[in-house]
């Protein structure tokens, strides 16, 4: 027979109010509250649970989950015990049989009539015993015996196997449908709770952060965020979780189980919600929209992180350098800068990366793939972000403005680099010579001087270059492309820098002079390059 490792107690499903909270409820809310509690009671009783356990009675007494006030009470004959009236439940005679369903209906009827009754008695049911009026009828369910008048059954309801209960208890459940979304729900009390989602009603507020919830169970789960409590532990690795559902999802990591498969691409997922979110990538659906800028997102978490950009909120702070971040994942990636950890490594060249996205972007360098094409000029790009930045060149949009000088830029990274020219900040230092640079890109170019790396190769002559701009200028020598023209002598030039030097060339201040056209250059290098052009022309 199947056994359960952890029995569900009445405390697990109880909706708990303090005395102060009960005073804030109006009559309609009190009625809803009573219905929820009675429904929970009924569910536990229907599966053979013993609701009047000693711990349960202590819980009911301490938490005072019923309204204070007008309970009809009387003192018993022994020790001044106080009992709540259950007048409608008669004592079972020797020839009377009472089912659990009948007992439940009688209890519910009485509790409904006196909904303001309190179950906070100091000795509600001594030693966890069920009142004889209620328990007398139970033997016919699990033993078939008929006790004598006033007799007690020695076996508690919790001892009754679930399979021995009458099957009619399960077939009598009704299905209720939500008018708003069409969802089917088994119990009317659960339907009332569900409808709070549509009306936006949130009765339960966190005392720490003020966040509101529609159900007390959600509030209790949320409060573990503040307390740090993680009662659900993984048996495999010992990791703790604040919710049982999170533990169940985590366990699939150990088993490797991924039961939810995408029909479009075949990708498998651990949780059905992950599959549902993934499908939006194929459909293009972005249901989460920012109210401020109108940007849409596939996932609610992305929208939440994006909203912090507008509010300026950066709740995640680095303990090492005090830098703040919008997202915890961004903080985790940043911490790797201090530790030097690079978990993503390229198998082709061995280069390591901190972030998964940077790793994926790098792999495109080896494949040479450029899937993003500009419709204006046909230019191809490896990444969508590069295409987006490029398209601003055609539109002329420069949405990133410098507050110091008013200069506009196509990208935020360009603005950030420019702002360092005002502050004089050069955060990127060369470990070899200590020279500082405004951008990491310039530092990477400089380091090739020390390493001797020249990754750009000319296929025409086999010459190697350390910079992409250098090989681009070099290729013009082979194709005789000279896009720049000297305004003084009309000579076509390969490099834009030659034309910029012209105003000084004819001032007489530059010592290097060309004997063919008479131009002077500030640097001998520029003259040598120009002479090579004359030789190529001849």
Swiss-Prot record:
InterPro entries: C2H2-ZF_domain, KRAB, KRAB_dom_sf, Znf_C2H2_sf, Znf_C2H2_type. Keywords: DNA-binding, Metal-binding, Nucleus, Repeat, Transcription, Transcription regulation, Zinc, Zinc-finger. Residues 8-78 form the KRAB domain. GO terms for cellular component: nucleus. It comes from the Eukaryota. It holds the Pfam family KRAB. One of its GO terms (molecular function) is DNA binding. Changing residue 474 to R: In a colorectal cancer sample; somatic mutation. It is found in: Nucleus. A zinc finger (C2H2-type) spans 176-198, 204-226, 232-254, 260-282, 288-310, 316-338, 344-366, 372-394, 400-422, 428-450, 456-478, 484-506. PROSITE patterns: KRAB, ZINC_FINGER_C2H2_1, ZINC_FINGER_C2H2_2. May be involved in transcriptional regulation. Belongs to the krueppel C2H2-type zinc-finger protein family. This is Zinc finger protein 155. It comes from Homo sapiens (Human). The lineage of its organism: Eukaryota, Metazoa, Chordata, Craniata, Vertebrata.
